[in-house]
């Protein structure tokens, strides 16, 4: 089972999905344009975290609504939910019957997830360049401008106009890879879908 800080790192990576879901091959300008225009996206994901000692794979679904609303639900091999309601990030571990809540600004304020609430973050926080193609997927490399960002780079891959994959390499050499499916770049989402109330009987912790 992943620790909370790893979950937030994954959230940080995936927040970029809003910016790239309709980018075309070699079109960093199109990526920027979509970042300015996109308001929401939903779909499914498979996440793999590779470290020197082990590899972990998880599956789930996600939805994002700008500004600043997101929900990530892990369904296999464990059940966890991450909800950002604009003020608070809620991490609900179903198996542990435990909820951890954190200030949204503190949890993701310095990470790529800031793009969720600030459309200028893409260009202000990253240096973007085309990064070639592999297995029919075209990549854009996003390098953080801050030296203490905690990760080396993010690679954003798209195929046939659709978001296909993302990769993040952290400062310790661990790599998180995500593949996407069932994307909807114009989902009918309401703000109410991102409200979270801790279930009765669970422990609630504050960071």
From Swiss-Prot:
Signal sequence range: 1-23
Q: What's this protein's function?
A: Participates in the translocation of lipoproteins from the inner membrane to the outer membrane. Only forms a complex with a lipoprotein if the residue after the N-terminal Cys is not an aspartate (The Asp acts as a targeting signal to indicate that the lipoprotein should stay in the inner membrane).
Its assembly, as annotated, is: Monomer.
Q: Does the keyword Cell inner membrane apply?
A: no
User: Which top-level group of life is the source organism from?
Assistant: Bacteria
Q: Name one Pfam family in it.
A: LolA
UniProt xrefs under HAMAP family: LolA
Which keywords belong to this entry? Chaperone, Periplasm, Protein transport, Signal, Transport
Xref: SUPFAM superfamilies: Prokaryotic lipoproteins and lipoprotein localization factors
Q: Which GO terms describe its cellular component?
A: periplasmic space
| TM region positions | none
| Organism per entry | Neisseria meningitidis serogroup B (strain ATCC BAA-335 / MC58)
* Annotated protein name in UniProt: Outer-membrane lipoprotein carrier protein
Which GO terms fall under biological process for this protein?
Answer: lipoprotein localization to outer membrane; lipoprotein transport
Q: Belongs to which family?
A: Belongs to the LolA family.
